[in-house]
Swiss-Prot record:
Its main location: plastid. The lineage of its organism: Eukaryota, Viridiplantae, Chlorophyta, Ulvophyceae, OUU clade. This is ATP synthase subunit alpha, chloroplastic. PROSITE patterns: ATPASE_ALPHA_BETA. Produces ATP from ADP in the presence of a proton gradient across the membrane. The alpha chain is a regulatory subunit. One of its GO terms (molecular function) is proton-transporting ATP synthase activity, rotational mechanism. ATP binds at G170, D171, R172, Q173, T174, G175, K176, T177. HAMAP family: ATP_synth_alpha_bact. It is found in: Plastid, Chloroplast thylakoid membrane. It is a peripheral membrane protein. The gene is atpA. It comes from Tupiella akineta (Green alga). Belongs to the ATPase alpha/beta chains family. Gene3D superfamilies: 2.40.30.20, ATP synthase alpha/beta chain, C-terminal domain, P-loop containing nucleotide triphosphate hydrolases.
Length: 502
């Protein structure tokens, strides 16, 4: 029989008492009393923060949005089918944040930055808050570096600078996404990180964009954040903030980034759905009162940082869809007032065969020529004015039978200028090609060429300059300036080519 040693027992008890810790873990727990339509109402969560993440019994995560006197209204980041009345909910004490790292480049992720492309997990050791403060006034610099889109119409007349916010607005099927994707393609080799955020789109449309970028070797510097049409409204609402957070990670490392939000109308609709289900009072077009703040706090995060912060930039190209060209609706007017200009795409122009279908008259860039290379500034000055005068004359000439020679000449040049702005999708032009195209049109070298042959002639001109006059392209690439030497080489080439045409 084992003999019990009282001394041993008492020493073990003393040891246990000495090691005892009075640490009390406080968990804020509540109970679900109503759930449905992606919304849960919870009783008992007394010390919860606005925007805090909540964890339900089945593992579903929610966000506390409405803090009321007797309950908390939360939106669910999932279907929440296993959540029942009486289920317990735990406050996590955390605000929504996502992992960030260089490994995200070339990947397709969802609104929570989790990969959905089947290429395995993404390694990251750092996280950033989805909602973070925009850079302050002292942290910024004025926009002064160009961000080339590769589209003659945009780069010449509605220039975009690094750190700018330029709205792309128009009816459905007018080529809004095409302009955005072309801009991503044109950043190849320019050390710009691109983030494409697809909100409420068909999975097939997103797959098309991914394939288009992959075919052209542009996926290596692009991140795609996808919240498809069948994802819960909460994730569609969060997707743009996730895109901005990923871009911010690179911006604060001194890199240049471009974010495309395609499109913010769908994000506003998702937010309206959430707000109405939470019984927030509806305002104009049934949107909640803070829908302006929804977009302003997102777009204000785009900036050109000061040199002290590394000089990085985030350029935002938000897209907004209009109904029947109505830019005076609630969401379009809100986003127009937040951004630094807009590119307006018209259905009528698109249907008349002019692509990209930009309405030059009401499109504007509030940054202007500060965001243009010297070469473009030199040749593009007269282009917008001449096109505006041409549009006015064209409308007038439909009613006038006999026109004087000067008017006829202006109409004939205008039709050729409009022709040189036409561009096929996914074929952005380099700066030297854009300059030669505009120079030829503005200085009358295209006047003797039939309108239907203008585009073929311009292709021939680019090929001729590349093969026979390589110095022209070299000067523009090295200096970004249209020097006297470059101008004389271009004039020489145009005389040689038009001489052979006439």
């Amino acid at each position: 029989m084992v003999k019990i040693q009282p001394d041993e027992i008492s020493s073990i008890i003393r040891q246990q008492i000495a090691q005892y810790s009075e640490e009390v873990k406080v968990v804020n727990v509540g109970t679900v009393f109503q759930v449905g339509d992606g919304i849960a109402r919870i009783y008992g969560l007394e010390k919860v923060m606005a925007g805090e993440l909540l964890e339900f019994e089945d593992g579903t995560i929610g966000i506390a949005l409405n803090l009321e006197t007797k309950n908390v209204g939360a939106v669910l980041m999932g279907d929440g089918l296993a959540i029942q009345e009486g289920s317990s909910v735990r406050a996590t004490g955390k605000i929504a944040q996502i992992p960030v790292s260089e490994s995200y480049l070339g990947r397709v992720v969802n609104s929570l930055a989790l990969p959905i492309d089947g290429k395995g997990a993404i390694n990251s050791s750092e996280t950033r808050l989805i909602e973070s403060l925009a850079p302050g006034i002292i942290s910024r610099r004025s926009v002064h570096e160009p961000l080339q889109t590769g589209l003659v119409a945009v780069d010449a007349m509605i220039p975009i600078g690094r750190g700018q916010r330029e709205l792309i607005i128009g009816d459905r099927q007018t080529g809004k996404t095409a302009i955005a994707v072309d801009t991503i393609i044109n950043q190849k080799g320019k050390d710009v990180i691109c983030v494409y955020v697809a909100i409420g789109q068909k999975a097939s449309s997103i797959a098309q964009v991914v394939n288009s970028l992959e075919e052209r070797g542009c996926l290596s510097y692009t991140i795609i954040v996808a919240a498809t049409a069948d994802t819960p409204a909460t994730l569609q609402y969060l997707a743009p903030y996730t895109g901005a957070t990923l871009a911010e990670y690179f911006m604060y490392k001194g890199r240049h980034t471009l974010v495309i939000y395609d499109d913010l109308s769908k994000q506003a609709q998702a937010y309206r759905e959430m707000s109405l289900l939470l019984r927030r009072p509806p305002g104009r077009e049934a949107f909640p009162g803070d829908v302006f703040y929804l977009h302003s706090r997102l777009l204000e995060r785009a900036a050109k940082l000061s040199d002290q912060l590394g000089g990085g930039s985030m350029t935002a190209l938000p897209i907004v869809e209009t109904q029947e060209g109505d830019v005076s609706a609630y969401i379009p007017t809100n986003v127009i007032s937040i951004t630094d200009g807009q590119i307006f795409l018209s259905g009528d122009i698109f249907n008349s065969g002019i692509r990209p279908a930009i309405n030059v008259g009401i499109s504007v860039s509030r940054v202007g020529s500060a965001a243009q290379p010297k070469a473009m500034k030199k040749v593009a000055g007269k282009l917008k004015l001449e096109l505006a005068q041409f549009a006015e004359l064209e409308a007038f000439s439909q009613f006038a039978s006999d026109l004087d020679q000067a008017t006829q000449k202006q109409l004939s040049r205008g039709s050729r200028l409009r022709e040189l702005l036409k561009q096929a999708q996914s074929s952005p032009l380099a700066l030297e090609d854009q300059v030669s195209t505009i120079y030829a049109g503005i200085n009358g070298y295209l006047d003797g060429i039939p309108v239907e042959n203008v585009r073929a002639f311009l292709v021939e001109l680019r090929q001729y300059l590349a093969s026979s006059k390589p110095k022209y392209g070299q000067i523009l690439r090295d200096t970004e300036a249209f020097t006297e030497e470059a101008e004389s080489i271009l004039k020489e080439a145009l005389v040689e080519l038009t001489g052979s045409k006439n």
